[in-house]
Amino acid sequence: LAGTDAPTPRDRWRARCAGLRAWAGANPQEYALLYGSPVPGYAAPPDTLDPATRVYVALAEPLRGVTAAVEERVVTGPLAADGARMAEALGLPLPPERAVRLLGAWATLFGLVSLELFGHTHNVVTDHDTFFAYHVDALADRLGL
């Protein structure tokens, strides 16, 4: 698992994000199958859900035991319930606000990888390594890492 031995939570976050990007670049068909357009009418068998969530658990791990150094926007109602459910599913003692923020970070991360992998930043971004690293660090800031 990328970043397991990294000295800080931020370094683990960086390593795991970079690992996801590297894997996607080396395995674009598999990435597209897992994270691309869903097949209409397809429902994944229940026994595939645990393996499918491993990447999310790995990306969430750097937050374990870290107290957010950022001001959390309060979430209420269904969004708070979603955040609490997500934190419980990950086995992380995160407040709902932090879990919701983590989900937004995942959405951004997978968006960055997908846009690059499928050529949607062609002629816009000339240095994808720097662009990706910049946004990974911005997400780390947002997560309080």
Feature annotation, model-predicted:
Residues 1-5, 35-38, 116-120:
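Secondary-structure edge/capping motif, primarily at the C-terminal ends of alpha-helices
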Residues 6, 45-48, 52, 98, ...:
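Alpha-helix initiation/capping motif
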Residues 1-30, 49-56:
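Hydrophobic alpha-helical connector segments
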Residues 57-145:
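C-terminal peripheral helix-coil segments that are non-catalytic and often amphipathic
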Residues 3-10, 42, 121-125:
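Short, surface-exposed loop/turn segments at secondary-structure junctions
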Residues 36-48:
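Solvent-exposed, charged amphipathic helical/linker segments at domain boundaries
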